[in-house]
């Protein structure tokens, strides 16, 4: 009898077969589920502490997605030969899992929860992120931890006008959309997508389609829980101290209402801090014992109630705007003199200084991913230092939030980049957030587009982004355009849309509540389009099109095409030829497998010289053409002459002069520059030259009766000895000079010596 109480559930999901297992692996975790989707295998585990830490005022959820290189049959390439810090993909996938599950934990549940997901086997055609989402949902559901799930998830493609469920890597190459949606049976909670300028109705249809398909996974998880679920925790939310809440409200309500009439963020924040301090001082004066953390939570609830009620009542928002107005926009291009391209984009109290840098092909990022190696020629990096929000903080390694915001901006802009053939540069865009009061990632999209156009990148269209918010109470709701930071914290949805005048290029949605209907999403998309068009108009006013010339400080790229079979000639033995080319011309040369050569130089003359020398190296010798070159070697039967770099031809002794040549050295010396004519080439590429073909035969000179060795007539080979007819021995010939026979003369000469 097995020691395991293993439970397995299998279901068909579109073109894939999905298997979920629990009870065999990681049994000491609160919950553990192994999910297999066509050989992509993911293990998700969840562990929660039984008690919350004292004074804890937030939900400490940690999600770690880890890819094991053995999953793809690889050994890590690092010095220590083991997995190191998380890759960008691992960080993004961790965020992708965190976002839909976080709002499903009950309010007041502050116990530590740690979710760890390992990819232990990978089919390159099946992405592990969807399997990881389903495995996490199943592990939480069977664990008994307080969790209002499960959730389902699906990837949606758009190919030939139809939605495709969970397209593989190959299919996605033909897809106009890559969208991931996650949610419960009743509501969508998270959307992450990029698209090729698709209209709003197509994007909304993809969200609805993916949500419906995700319910298939939810049904299977319910079945797994019925058979293998652990008892649900006997957890009850801490009782609210109604008496303390009333006292806090009496002391702080009026002061906070007054604070939220202040339009300036810093002044408003300072007023709120003073209100918080006054409430605590008032409670102390009344002799009330209180927990400072709990009191601050109560004051935050009062802030949320004030802001939300004002908006739903149709009153002006925090900064005085209505629900559809975009904050004032200021744009300045070329703000940094020696960068390749730059833009300062300011929208209200959110500001991004965005800089673009152009590089060569070797500047592209080479990524050794689990599914295979690839190069990325478009890099987008987002940085937000503490001073952007007027705070004191530590500067350290890149945070998960910065990686996520950078990837969203990159997705938004990628659809409008020129092809590699049109613009062979590697592009790096860096967004430095210098002020932040909401929607800094969308400011990065706008600034990134403008800075690339300032750098001379021929963008297909202007790209703008806008962040939308939502306030919902019962059946009343208000969609907010261009949300502030406070509206993001106090609202129910963060909905970011980026695109062009033609359609959407990126969409990200995080919903904190259930009950967001298709109709609400339609309103949000329509309102976002209106705002996007307004911002695009401002951007087009500031910069109508990309600069015709790239910066004088950027490397100039010149491309040429050669026969792929000639690549080895350009590289040379051990790289000697290309190394000499780059050193002597002061250029950078990259060679593609298809024979495309890219020459990078800030000096056009140097690039032209490199191009000329490459053309010489790769040129084909033409029959009948006259070449000038040095004699590289003297042979007994002729000489070798260099025609082109790396290409010599044979000048036979019979082709040196019209008269008979006894010694080649009498006519030619090594290093001598001569002109020769190409007479023919054979199938092996050997070239035959002629020097005498360039001069006329002197008058009166007759052709030699005896042909030169290379020009003698072809003779049939002699028959084998056993096949020859018997012949009588011939009589010795008389010497031509009438002397002794040759043999006798030779013997006498040897005796004399």
UniProtKB/Swiss-Prot annotation:
UniProt protein name: Polyribonucleotide nucleotidyltransferase
Region listing for Disordered, in residue ranges: 692-753
Family assignment from sequence similarity: Belongs to the polyribonucleotide nucleotidyltransferase family.
Residue intervals of the KH domain: 555-614
MF terms in GO: 3'-5'-RNA exonuclease activity; magnesium ion binding; polyribonucleotide nucleotidyltransferase activity; RNA binding
Origin organism lineage: Bacteria, Pseudomonadati, Pseudomonadota, Betaproteobacteria, Burkholderiales
Entries under InterPro entries matching the protein: ExoRNase_PH_dom1, ExoRNase_PH_dom2, ExoRNase_PH_dom2_sf, KH_dom, KH_dom_type_1, KH_dom_type_1_sf, NA-bd_OB-fold, PNPase
Entry GO terms, CC: cytosol
Amino acid composition bias (Basic and acidic residues), ranges on this chain: 699-739
PROSITE patterns on file: KH_TYPE_1 (PS50084), S1 (PS50126)
Entries under SMART domains matching the protein: KH, S1
Reactions this protein catalyses: RNA(n+1) + phosphate = RNA(n) + a ribonucleoside 5'-diphosphate
Binding site for Mg(2+): 488, 494
Keywords: Cytoplasm, Magnesium, Metal-binding, Nucleotidyltransferase, RNA-binding, Transferase
């Amino acid at each position: 009898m097995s020691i395991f109480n293993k439970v397995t559930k299998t279901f068909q999901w579109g073109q894939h077969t999905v298997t979920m297992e629990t009870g065999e692996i990681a049994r000491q975790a609160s919950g553990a589920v192994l999910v297999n989707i066509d050989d992509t295998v993911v293990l998700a585990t969840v562990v929660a502490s039984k008690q919350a830490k004292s004074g804890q005022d937030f939900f400490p959820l940690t999600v770690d997605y880890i890819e094991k290189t053995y999953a793809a049959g690889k050994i890590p390439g690092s010095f220590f030969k083991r997995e190191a810090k998380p890759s960008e993909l691992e960080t993004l996938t961790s965020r992708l899992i965190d976002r839909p599950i976080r709002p499903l934990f009950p309010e007041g549940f502050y116990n530590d929860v740690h979710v760890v997901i390992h990819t232990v086997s990978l089919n390159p055609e099946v992405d592990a992120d969807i399997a990881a989402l389903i495995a996490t949902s199943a592990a939480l559901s069977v664990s008994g931890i307080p969790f209002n799930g499960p959730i389902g998830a699906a990837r949606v493609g758009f190919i030939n006008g139809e939605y495709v469920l969970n397209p593989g890597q190959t299919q996605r190459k033909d897809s106009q959309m890559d969208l991931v949606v996650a949610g419960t049976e009743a509501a969508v909670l998270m959307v992450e997508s990029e698209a090729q300028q698709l209209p709003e109705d197509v994007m909304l249809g993809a969200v609805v389609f993916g949500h419906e398909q995700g319910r298939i996974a939810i049904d299977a998880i319910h079945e797994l829980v019925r058979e293998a679920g652990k008892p649900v925790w006997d957890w009850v939310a801490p009782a609210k101290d109604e008496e303390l809440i009333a006292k806090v409200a009496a002391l702080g309500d009026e002061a906070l209402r007054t604070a939220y009439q202040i339009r300036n963020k810093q002044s408003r924040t300072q007023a709120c801090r003073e209100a918080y301090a006054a409430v605590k001082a008032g409670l102390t004066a009344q002799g009330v014992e209180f927990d400072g953390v709990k009191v601050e939570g109560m004051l935050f609830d009062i802030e949320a109630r004030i802001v939300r009620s004002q908006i739903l009542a149709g009153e002006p928002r925090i900064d005085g705007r209505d629900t559809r107005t975009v904050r004032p926009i200021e744009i300045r291009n070329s703000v940094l003199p020696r960068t390749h391209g730059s833009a300062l984009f300011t929208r209200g109290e959110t500001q991004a200084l965005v800089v673009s840098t152009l590089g060569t092909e070797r500047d592209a990022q080479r990524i050794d991913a689990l599914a295979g190696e690839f190069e990325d020629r478009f890099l987008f990096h987002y940085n937000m230092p503490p001073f952007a929000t007027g705070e004191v903080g530590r500067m350290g390694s890149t945070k998960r939030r910065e990686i996520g915001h950078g990837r969203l901006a990159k997705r938004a802009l990628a659809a409008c980049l020129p092809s590699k053939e049109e613009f062979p540069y590697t592009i790096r865009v860096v967004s430095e957030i210098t002020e932040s009061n909401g929607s800094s990632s969308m400011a990065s999209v706008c600034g990134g587009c403008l800075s690339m156009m300032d750098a001379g990148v021929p963008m297909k269209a202007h790209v703008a982004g806008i962040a939308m918010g939502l306030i919902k109470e019962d059946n009343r709701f208000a969609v907010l355009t261009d949300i502030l930071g406070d509206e993001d914290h106090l609202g129910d949805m963060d909905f970011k849309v980026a695109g062009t005048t033609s359609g959407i290029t990126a969409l990200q949605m995080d919903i904190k509540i259930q009950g967001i209907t298709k109709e609400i999403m339609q309103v949000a998309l329509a309102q976002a389009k209106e705002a996007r068009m307004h911002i695009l108009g401002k951007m087009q006013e500031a910069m109508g099109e990309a600069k015709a010339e790239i910066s004088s400080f950027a490397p100039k790229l010149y491309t040429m095409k050669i026969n792929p079979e000639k690549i080895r000639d350009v590289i040379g033995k051990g790289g000697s030829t290309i190394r000499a080319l780059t050193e002597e011309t002061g250029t950078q040369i990259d060679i593609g497998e298809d024979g495309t050569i890219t020459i990078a130089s800030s000096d056009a003359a140097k690039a032209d010289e490199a191009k000329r020398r490459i053309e010489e190296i790769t040129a084909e010798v033409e029959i009948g053409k006259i070449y000038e070159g040095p004699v590289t070697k003297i042979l007994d039967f002729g000489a070798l002459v260099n025609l082109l770099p790396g290409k010599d031809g044979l000048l036979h002794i019979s082709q040196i002069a019209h008269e008979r040549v006894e010694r080649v050295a009498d006519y030619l010396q090594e290093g001598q520059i001569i002109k020769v004519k190409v007479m023919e080439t054979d199938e092996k590429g050997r070239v035959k030259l002629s020097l005498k073909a360039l001069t006329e035969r002197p008058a009166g000179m007759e052709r030699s009766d005896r042909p030169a060795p290379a020009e003698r007539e072809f003779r049939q080979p002699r028959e084998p000895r056993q096949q020859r007819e018997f012949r009588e021995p011939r009589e010795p010939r008389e010497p031509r000079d009438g002397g002794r026979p040759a043999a006798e003369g030779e013997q006498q000469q040897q005796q004399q010596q």
